[in-house]
Swiss-Prot record:
Catalytic reaction equation(s): trans-aconitate + S-adenosyl-L-methionine = (E)-3-(methoxycarbonyl)pent-2-enedioate + S-adenosyl-L-homocysteine
Cellular component GO terms held in the UniProt record: cytoplasm
Any single GO BP term: methylation
Role noted for this protein: Catalyzes the S-adenosylmethionine monomethyl esterification of trans-aconitate.
Family in the record: Belongs to the methyltransferase superfamily. Tam family.
Protein name: Trans-aconitate 2-methyltransferase
């Protein structure tokens, strides 16, 4: 599990793209020239940007070779760069930085967010969506299973919080629109929840384990999910998935 799996990620493409659609709808820009899609993955969010601004120069950035290859194949009219978001530098100031479900993987948002704002044109926009599920059972149970089985904590850090992001971006010279939405995804089984998180949040926990250790981890994780997520009357499961949205526009 050394690299991301585009096929597994796109298994829930509609559910993963919906927050990007809703974030994009709140971006207050019309005619723009330069756009970056940070953590573009297989290009599903980049495609939305290209549809809205077909004449813009759109650059997708991702650290995964597999994801970049998939995005290039799907969107030949866009540019894609394999790079670490923290180190990537655009060739010119940007009108829009779009980051859908990517920045939560990176540390030290107190430095990262002002850095991203500095890459914008005057009145440019930073649009961010991040899963805010660190305290949801899906992610709490990952930590509990790892503790039970004496594996190191490899999960991501919790988000800084609404008030912190507002202060960070206000001090960076932005007007800030911030909101939180909880989606309730209809899942056919507990295994479907595992399939979902294996493509994203569960990756760091599994990537350094042997095949036998992975199976042991997933068996226990499945048992604990059954305890936390009861079946609905029709046999499905409602998976609560909170997400934090931020649209910050430079005022100078």
């Amino acid at each position: 599990m050394s690299d991301w799996n585009p096929s597994l990620y796109l298994h829930f493409a509609a559910e993963r793209s919906r927050p990007a659609v809703e974030l994009l709808a709140r971006v207050p820009l019309e005619n723009i020239k330069y756009v970056a899609d940070l953590g573009c993955g297989p290009g599903n969010s980049t495609a939305l940007l290209h549809q809205r601004w077909p004449a813009a120069r759109i650059t997708g950035v991702d650290s995964s070779p597999a994801m970049i290859a998939e995005a290039r194949s799907a969107l030949p009219d866009c540019q894609f760069v394999e790079a670490d978001i923290r180190n990537w530098q655009p060739e010119q100031a940007l009108d829009l930085i779009f980051a859908n479900a990517s920045l939560q993987w990176l540390p030290d948002h107190y430095e990262l967010f002002p850095h991203l704002v500095s890459l914008l044109n005057s009145h440019g926009v930073l649009a961010v969506q991040m899963p805010d599920n660190w305290l949801e059972p899906t992610h709490v149970l990952m930590r509990e299973v790892a503790w039970e089985q004496n594996y190191p904590d490899r999960g991501r850090e919790p988000l800084a919080g609404v008030h912190a992001y507002y202060d960070i971006l206000s001090e960076a010279g932005c007007e800030v629109d911030i909101w939180r939405t909880t989606y309730y995804h209809q899942m056919p089984s507990h295994q479907a929840i595992i399939d979902w998180v294996t493509a994203t949040g569960l990756r760091p926990w599994l990537q350094d384990l042997t095949e036998s250790e992975q199976q042991h981890f997933l068996t226990r994780y499945h048992q604990m999910l059954e305890e936390q997520y009861p079946l609905q009357e029709n046999g499905e499961i409602l998976l609560a998935f909170p997400r934090l949205f931020i649209v910050a526009r430079r005022t100078e």
